[in-house]
Amino acid sequence: MRVLVASRNKKKLAELNRMLEAANVTGIELVGLGDLPEYPETPETGATFVDNARIKTNDGVRHTGLPTIADDSGLAVDALNGMPGVLSARWSGGHGDDKANNDLLLAQMGDVPDERRGAHFVSSCVLQLPAQVAAERGMETEYAVEGRWYGRVLRAEQGEGGFGYDPLFAPDELPEGQEEQLAGKSAGELTAEQKDAVSHRGKALRQLVEILAQLAD
């Protein structure tokens, strides 16, 4: 079955495909927004991560008639009262300018002592099914899942992997058996597979994969 992933980020599609393969789920063809000839941009006007994900899945089902997955993820910094939060991608004013966002966060955290640099990533994922598909499969029309990844904000970027705030985030939780080897590393220094094992998105997507298995042809 074709399933729309309401994102133009190819890394997100690759991430979900890895999760499906790891769970031996076949028969799901993921389609990204970049694969569609025309698709209007969806404004992210929600007050929470799950609100934004739901806005995108509603649009996806309405425009394509396909089961649609969307996520909204971000970084919540304790010393900033949970911000950037839902504004993570556009914290510096533009949208998706990782360097500007990271530079601004570093400036805002410049005087914050180590013991107050706690933060966590949040990923809210929503799967919405067209009513007919849900009825045929005996499923709900909407599923929402969430994953969190706790750590702290570093004082300088480390690593060039991942995306977003990854180079500034030192996770508390690391892949089992690799804690000593990876101690002090940023999320931007982990491999994709290492991130999948422990990250907020990895946790949310594993829950989603269990649901997607019911759609496999």
Swiss-Prot record:
Q: Which InterPro entries match?
A: dITP/XTP_pyrophosphatase, ITPase-like_fam, RdgB/HAM1
- The UniProt annotation places substrate binding at S7, R8, N9, K10, K11, K12, S73, F163, G164, Y165, D166, K195, H200, R201
Assigned GO CC terms: cytosol
**Keyword set, alphabetical order:** Hydrolase, Magnesium, Metal-binding, Nucleotide metabolism, Nucleotide-binding
Q: Which Gene3D superfamilies match?
A: 3.90.950.10
Binding note for cofactor = Binds 1 Mg(2+) ion per subunit.
The cofactors named for this UniProt entry are:
Mg(2+)
Q: Please name the GO terms of the biological process aspect recorded for this protein, alphabetically.
A: nucleotide metabolic process; purine nucleoside triphosphate catabolic process
The catalytic activity of this protein is classed by the Enzyme Commission as: 3.6.1.66
| A molecular-function term among this protein's GO annotations | metal ion binding
Q: Which residues bind Mg(2+)?
A: D72
Q: Which reaction does it catalyse?
A: XTP + H2O = XMP + diphosphate + H(+); dITP + H2O = dIMP + diphosphate + H(+); ITP + H2O = IMP + diphosphate + H(+)
Functionally, this protein is described as follows: Pyrophosphatase that catalyzes the hydrolysis of nucleoside triphosphates to their monophosphate derivatives, with a high preference for the non-canonical purine nucleotides XTP (xanthosine triphosphate), dITP (deoxyinosine triphosphate) and ITP. Seems to function as a house-cleaning enzyme that removes non-canonical purine nucleotides from the nucleotide pool, thus preventing their incorporation into DNA/RNA and avoiding chromosomal lesions.
Summarize subunit and interaction data from the UniProt record for this chain: Homodimer.
Q: To which protein family does this belong?
A: Belongs to the HAM1 NTPase family.
| Protein name per the record | dITP/XTP pyrophosphatase
Query: Organism, per UniProt?
Result: Corynebacterium jeikeium (strain K411)
